[in-house]
Amino acid sequence: EYEYNNSNYILLGAIIEKVSGKDYFTFIKENILDKAGMTNSGYFASETTNTVSPLVRSEKGDSWIEVERGKGKGSSAGGSYSNVNDILKFSNALKNNLIVSKETLKNMISVKNNNMIVTEDYGYGFIIQKFAQELSYGHGGTAKGVNFEFRYFPNSDITFVIFSNQDNGAYDDLKRNTTKLITGER
């Protein structure tokens, strides 16, 4: 039975450290962020500045409350920050084989969970979905006060990125309607 679990990403981070001989954050900076030109991305630390705070609605729903971030640096399972321009650079780096080979990307976006979920499949690190018969791959993430989605449509060569510092609100509608615009779905 397929079920998404962040602990697999913690294990992947440990494997990266063992195989590369580098700590996870250094490896990601050198092999993804730097190669893709992602200068506004990284992992939270106490000195991180110029980021937007996550927000949640009060219990009464009449105000917004800032969510306090954890004190740690993050991990291979989360705790990173970025912006739209850097995620577009990431998408372009994938397409142009700057961070993985064409063969590796093909392997990453091939279905690994044998179609066990009706609406999506899973590859290596990517959720694979079809919208109106158009293939897409990407990944999202949520945490208290945060929503994120990155999706690439290879047939139309369109990438869309959503960042939200809220864990409710217009995120789902924005994601759904943007996908409809890209695919022509009604």
Regions inferred by a protein language model and the residue ranges of each:
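Short, gly/Ser/Thr-rich active-site loops of penicillin-recognizing serine hydrolases
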Residues: D167-R186
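Short, well-ordered beta-strand elements
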Residues: G138-H139, E149-Y152, S156-Q166
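Short acidic, gly/pro-rich beta-turn/loop elements at beta-sheet edges
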Residues: V118, S136, F160-I162, A170-D172
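Short, surface-exposed loop or secondary-structure junction motifs
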Residues: E1-T142
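Short, glycine/serine-rich, charged loops/turns that create anion-binding
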Residues: L94, Q166-D167
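Glycine-centered structural positions embedded in regular secondary structure
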Residues: G125, G141, T159, L174-K175, ...
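Short, small/polar residue-rich loop motifs at catalytic or cofactor-binding pockets
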Residues: G145-V146
